[in-house]
A protein has these predicted regions:
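Short C-terminal domain-edge/linker segments immediately following a structured domain
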Residues: 55, 96-100, 124-128, 204-207
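Short beta-strands and strand-loop turn motifs
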Residues: 65-68, 93-98, 142-146
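Conserved phosphate/ATP/ADP-binding segment of small-molecule kinases
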Residues: 107-189
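Small-residue (G/A/S/T)-rich helix-start motifs and N-terminal tracts that mark the onset
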Residues: 1-81, 86-88, 93, 160-208
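Glycine/small-residue-rich loop that forms an oxyanion/phosphate-binding "nest" at active or ligand-binding sites
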Residues: 76-125
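Intrinsic-disorder/low-complexity, polar/charged segments
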Residues: 51, 73, 104, 152-155
Length: 208
């Protein structure tokens, strides 16, 4: 099984390198450059447009979009919504990072509006963010996961099962970053043990 996953992953990576897809990113000002560089490193070509007057045209022309909810001020709300809706219209893949979900009432209202009006291909966040998306059962420590939510060898099976059930309910892939990463659809959950404690000391590793 592991060999098959590695082979499939290598083929996907090679395909990205060959096609060099243009990926539209709505990021936050803390990690915009890092996210653009990570897209380049993976073989894609980033565009970071976030003006509401152009995001629909940009998103429709790209191979897919990533919406990062790190900045909910002013025009970002409209830009995220327009980007999400046009991706749904043209049936492009759409990744959503609900940064800080559960941290503040305003941010939660922005989140609810997006989830109500946009379907996401992938929702990825730390465990506290994902649990808030799923059932409002967790409160993030700012944009970091709450200590009591973090995955361990004792709790990872329950987290994986939660991710599968949430994936089925929302009809989306769920990716949870943490000490042990979880990537799940309704049928399977994969655990990735490639993390390091130092990653939590560098801002934006989840965004990337």
């Amino acid at each position: 099984m592991t060999g098959d996953i590695l082979k499939d992953s290598a083929e996907i990576f090679a395909n990205i390198q060959e096609k060099a897809p243009v990926v539209h990113n709505i990021s936050n000002y803390i990690t915009a450059t890092d996210c653009a560089n990570m897209t380049l490193a993976c073989g894609g070509s980033p565009t970071m447009a976030d003006d509401p007057d152009e995001v629909e045209e940009i998103a429709a022309a790209c191979a897919g979009s990533v919406i990062n909810m790190g900045n909910t001020a002013g025009h970002y709300q409209e830009s995220m919504l327009r980007t999400g809706m046009v991706n749904n219209k043209v049936d492009h893949p759409l990744v959503f990072d609900p940064v800080g979900a559960g941290a503040a009432a305003h941010r939660n209202a922005v989140l609810e509006n997006l989830l109500d009006k946009v379907h996401f291909s992938v929702i990825r966040g730390n465990i506290s963010e994902v649990k808030f998306v799923g059932d409002k059962s967790s409160k993030a420590n700012g944009v970091d996961a709450a200590a009591e939510d973090l995955a361990s060898e004792d709790t990872i099976d329950g987290i994986a099962e939660y991710a599968k059930k949430l994936s089925e309910r929302l009809n989306t892939v769920i990716a949870i970053s943490g000490p042990i990463d979880v990537v799940a659809d309704a049928n399977k959950a994969y655990l990735i043990r490639n993390g390091h404690p130092m990653m939590s000391r560098v801002t934006g590793t989840g965004c990337m």
